[in-house]
Amino acid sequence: MMSLNHLTMAEALAGLRAGEFTATELTEAHLRAVEATRGLNIFITETADIALRQAKAADERYAAGTALPMDGLPIAVKDLFCTEGVLTTAASHILDGFKPPYESSVTANLWRDGAVMLGKVNLDEFAMGSANITSYYGPVISPWSKGRRVQRDAAPAGSGVLSEVAEAFRQPQPVTEWEWERRLVPGGSSGGSAAAVAARVAMAATGTDTGGSIRQPASFVGIVGLKPTYGRCSRWGIVAFASSLDQAGPMTRTVRDAAIMLRSMAGFDPKDSTSADVPVPDYEKAITGDIRGLRVGIPREYRVDGMPAEIDRLWQQGVEWLKAAGAVPVEISLPHTKYALPAYYIVAPAEASSNLARYDGVRFGLRVEGKDLKEMYENTRGEGFGREVRRRILIGTYVLSAGYYDAYYLKAQKVRARIAEDFTKAWEQCDVILTPTAPNTAFGIGEKMDDPIAMYLNDVFTVPANLAGLPGLSVPAGLAANGLPLGLQLVGRPFDEATLIRTAAVLEQAAGPQPLPPVHA
């Protein structure tokens, strides 16, 4: 029998309903996986007690015939979602010790539907990054990194005669550590979520996507990442980065699992003024395999200079897969695409600088004392925020300042409107758009740390959908010559995640089963 932590969500639900195993057994298998992969630095907070309590409740519901849509499925939660009574850090020193007195709407929806929380996973600090290297708790290591487990004796060496005598009778205390040939990034900012799902530590994970933070890491580790339409999932209780861009979504191993999880995550929330009051369909029913006549837009502007030939070939292969299934490729133009990244890196830091003004050391989190209130603010923010967060606060404050507001922020918002118009016109010609997810495969930890512009370019294909508020999905499509995963991205009409899911399932079927990463539980 397949290891329980290697089952998909759909397979696990079938097994639970058939009584082949219990939710407690499924959860215990995943808790062992959490322990076995600690060397990847995936989790900030593990919640084994909560998980086992939730699993026991799920077993009782299965026994009573009242099982819920996600009953007993162990998942990981990106540590940007507030969880009542459980440490929530946003991977930042400034939120030290913060345990929210409330639950985010998205996680509340998941617990309502029976999901089991394994813990809170690592991310780039305040979701600002594309590699999961800006976390106060250290970088997440991709399960696609090359390394090996080694056993070492954990006992400290003493000195003196008594220590030598004790050493002679001591039992060895082996601990497992990792030796790495090359540590790769898992992408970001939802790198912990991506690594947890790819390494078979969690069946699925929540992510957030502001400029590609679900889709790009999904591409880097070979899983499915779905950013819904802005407003589809509530933002209430999610630590804010850029409020007009942030959107929660599922990260899973299959398209069907993403459909199952999105149905539980989504829904109107009166506590979020940007939440859309639109029906949530049964996304699993969209997976029909029938895309005959579907018009697939191929934007000519996405053929960027310097894009590796193998990514271009994979893109063309994706077109052929859809064409073979009866879809109709259509070349389209999104003329303002080249302005998307610079506009994003004005709008997002501007909103971040405003959102992060609330962290002052007064009511919660870190406080570094000073001789007066002003110095306490300065000390707390200076010590509490990491380098990348400070950089984006400075950029945001600059572009919002009186002398530069019109030249930068106002102009960026006008460009954003043009980008949205480009997509609106494109929908007259096509039903869905196909592009690469990222311009490269995963790179080594530390390789781009000193070049923020090179790091920002990781989001070149994903940012436009955020600026336009559109749904986007990354589906694994194969391996590059270097043996690392590559993804293809689908972008859809507002609130038409169903068509994305239907189309992605066809790509998934054509690409075939994807290999396990070298490091997995």
Curated annotation (Swiss-Prot):
Gene Ontology annotations of biological process type: translation
Task: Decide whether keyword Kinase is in the record.
Answer: no
One Gene Ontology CC term in the entry: glutamyl-tRNA(Gln) amidotransferase complex
InterPro entries, per the entry: Amidase, Amidase_CS, Amidase_dom, AS_sf, GatA
SUPFAM superfamilies documented for this protein: Amidase signature (AS) enzymes (SSF75304)
**Listed Pfam families:** Amidase
Superkingdom of the organism of origin = Bacteria
| A molecular-function term among this protein's GO annotations | ATP binding
Q: In the Enzyme Commission scheme, what number(s) does this protein have?
A: 6.3.5.7
Annotated catalysed reactions? L-glutamyl-tRNA(Gln) + L-glutamine + ATP + H2O = L-glutaminyl-tRNA(Gln) + L-glutamate + ADP + phosphate + H(+)
Q: Which PANTHER family match?
A: GLUTAMYL-TRNA(GLN) AMIDOTRANSFERASE SUBUNIT A, TRANSAMIDASE
Name the family: Belongs to the amidase family. GatA subfamily.
Describe the task this protein carries out.
Allows the formation of correctly charged Gln-tRNA(Gln) through the transamidation of misacylated Glu-tRNA(Gln) in organisms which lack glutaminyl-tRNA synthetase. The reaction takes place in the presence of glutamine and ATP through an activated gamma-phospho-Glu-tRNA(Gln).
Please report the name of this protein according to its UniProt entry. Glutamyl-tRNA(Gln) amidotransferase subunit A
Q: Which organism is it from?
A: Rhodospirillum centenum (strain ATCC 51521 / SW)
